[in-house]
Amino acid sequence: MRLGLCVVALVLSWTHLTISSRGIKGKRQRRISAEGSQACAKGCELCSEVNGCLKCSPKLFILLERNDIRQVGVCLPSCPPGYFDARNPDMNKCIKCKIEHCEACFSHNFCTKCKEGLYLHKGRCYPACPEGSSAANGTMECSSPAQCEMSEWSPWGPCSKKQQLCGFRRGSEERTRRVLHAPVGDHAACSDTKETRRCTVRRVPCPEGQKRRKGGQGRRENANRNLARKESKEAGAGSRRRKGQQQQQQQGTVGPLTSAGPA
C-alpha cells in the first residue's frame, strides 16, 4: 500500500514539473517574439532593441541617428540634407558630409550645394567667392575666368642655326602652341606660345652652291662695312678742311685799324 502511494506521488510530481517547464518556455518565446515585432520597423530586416535597425531592405538606406550615447539605425528611402548615399551590395548607407556648412554632397569631401547664403567653389562653401572668381549668372556657384584654349604642342622642329640646317654642330629647335579659343571680349589675353631649346647634331657639310652663296653674302657684307668706314673717314676729313677754310677766311677779312683825318 505504501509503495503504491509513493509511485502515485512521484508521477504527480513529474507531471507538475513538466507542465511548469512548458509554460515557462512558452512565455519566453512569446516575450522574444513580441520584442522583435516592436523593435523592427517597416523596411528593416534585422534589428536590435538597443541599436534599432541593423539591416534595411535592399532599396532603402540606413541612417545612424545619435540618441544620447547610442546610435540608432533608421531605414529611409533617400538620405536627408547633409548626407550622401553610398550604395553597397551588402547594405546602402547614408554618410554625413564632412564639408562644413554643406547641404548636399557628392562624396564626404566634395560639396554640391551649400547652405543658404553661402557660395560654392570647387566643392567647398564660402561666405564670398574667393579672389579671382565670381558668381556665375546670378547663382551661388563661383567660377574662375575663362581660360585660353590652346592647341597641343607641335612636334619639335629641325635643329637649325641662323636659319641654316647645315655647317654646324650645336643649334636650337622650337615648337609652338596656337590659340584655339580666346575668352569673349579678351582676345589680347591669349597669344601663340613658342618654346625653344638647344640641340646638338652631327655636323653636316653644306652643299657647294649654298657655300658659295654664303661666302658671297659674307664678302658683300665685308665690302659694305669697308665702304661705310671709308665714307665715314672722308666725311671727317671734309669736315676738317671746311673748318680750316672758314678760319682762314675770317683771318683774311680782319685788317689793321686806320684813323681817318683831313688830307
From Swiss-Prot:
InterPro entries: Furin_repeat, Growth_fac_rcpt_cys_sf, R-spondin, Rspo_Fu-CRD_dom, TSP1_rpt, TSP1_rpt_sf. Abundantly expressed in adrenal glands, ovary, testis, thyroid and trachea but not in bone marrow, spinal cord, stomach, leukocytes colon, small intestine, prostate, thymus and spleen. GO terms for biological process: positive regulation of canonical Wnt signaling pathway; positive regulation of protein phosphorylation; positive regulation of Wnt signaling pathway; regulation of receptor internalization; Wnt signaling pathway. It is found in: Secreted; Nucleus. Changing F106E: Abolishes activation of Wnt signaling. Residues 218-234 have a biased composition (Basic and acidic residues). Glycans are attached at N137, W153, W156. SMART domains: FU (SM00261), TSP1 (SM00209). Disulfide bonds join C40-C47, C44-C53, C56-C75, C79-C94, C97-C105, C102-C111, C114-C125, C129-C142, C148-C190, C159-C166, C199-C206. Residues 147-207 form the TSP type-1 domain. It comes from the Eukaryota. Residues 206-263 are annotated as: Disordered. It is linked to Keratoderma, palmoplantar, with squamous cell carcinoma of skin and sex reversal: A recessive syndrome characterized by XX (female to male) SRY-independent sex reversal, palmoplantar hyperkeratosis and predisposition to squamous cell carcinoma of the skin. The FU repeats are required for activation and stabilization of beta-catenin. This is R-spondin-1. It comes from Homo sapiens. The gene is RSPO1.
